[in-house]
Structures are given as structure tokens and as C-alpha cells.
Amino acid sequence: MRIVYLLFPFILLLAQGAAGSSLALGKREKCLRRNGFCAFLKCPTLSVISGTCSRFQVCCKTLLG
């Protein structure tokens, strides 16, 4: 019975992650439609931030293309 107390927080975390995943997918698709790509925290060299994909991902666009 004690394992239920240990599993309950993990189940809540999984449910919370699943609830916000559809919103992140929409932002990612919007970034890709604008000829951008998602990167973790910062854009690589020769690209600029043009929006956000999720909490820790930014939408980047290359300067050369």
C-alpha cells in the first residue's frame, strides 16, 4: 500500500506533461511554417531568435537563408 503513495506524484507529473504537450506542438509547427527551427535555450551561430517553441526551446531563423 505504501507504493501507492510513491507512485501518485509520478502519475501527476505525467498527467501534467501530457496536458501541455499539444500547445508545444502547435508552437513548433508554427515555427517550422515560418522557415525556422527549434533550439535549446539559444540559437546557434548565424541565426537569430524569432519566437519560442516551448519553455526551454526558442524558435531560430538563419541569417543567410
From Swiss-Prot:
Coiled coil: none annotated. Residues 1-25 form the signal peptide. GO terms for molecular function: CCR6 chemokine receptor binding; chemoattractant activity. One of its GO terms (cellular component) is extracellular space. It is found in: Secreted. It comes from the Eukaryota. GO terms for biological process: cell chemotaxis; defense response to bacterium. This is Antimicrobial peptide THP1.
